[in-house]
Amino acid sequence: MTKTITPSSQGLDQKWYVIDATDQRLGRLACEVAKILRGKNKPTYTPHMDTGDFVIIINADKVAVTGRKSTQKLYRRHSGRPGGMKIETFEKLQQRIPERIIEKAVKGMLPKNALGRQLFTKLKVYPGPNHPHQAQKPEELTLNTIPNGDK
């Protein structure tokens, strides 16, 4: 009889990946990043454990959306005070805080519990091409989020 083996937390090797978001589609990029953060790309995937890897996303200010989403997609936040709702379009948020767009997209694709919050801390997003994680020796990961290979 075979038994299911649960990996120990010490035996997991967590890699670092760097992904360039230039001209990548937002939703497709976020989906792939969420899979890597959860560890679904590994044979040791366990739903209740953090078996995923660290992901660094660079050039977050150059992420693309299709159609009219740049003017119609809205991001809402609330201060907690009466009348404190702030609404911002994709374009304005991309000019102001471009990394928040990718963070919100990926966070929405992670579990809504303590594990999801822990996984989210392994995502590092930077608006430009530079990041401070060279010491971790991240691997370059190329994702093709453009359907039919356009561009």
From Swiss-Prot:
UniProt-recorded name of the protein: Large ribosomal subunit protein uL13
| GO MF terms, alphabetically ordered | mRNA binding; structural constituent of ribosome
Give the UniProt family note.
Belongs to the universal ribosomal protein uL13 family.
Where is composition skewed (Polar residues) in this entry? 142-151
Keywords in alphabetical order: Ribonucleoprotein, Ribosomal protein
Q: Which NCBIfam families match?
A: rplM_bact
What biological function has been recorded for the protein in this entry? This protein is one of the early assembly proteins of the 50S ribosomal subunit, although it is not seen to bind rRNA by itself. It is important during the early stages of 50S assembly.
One of the protein's GO biological processes: translation
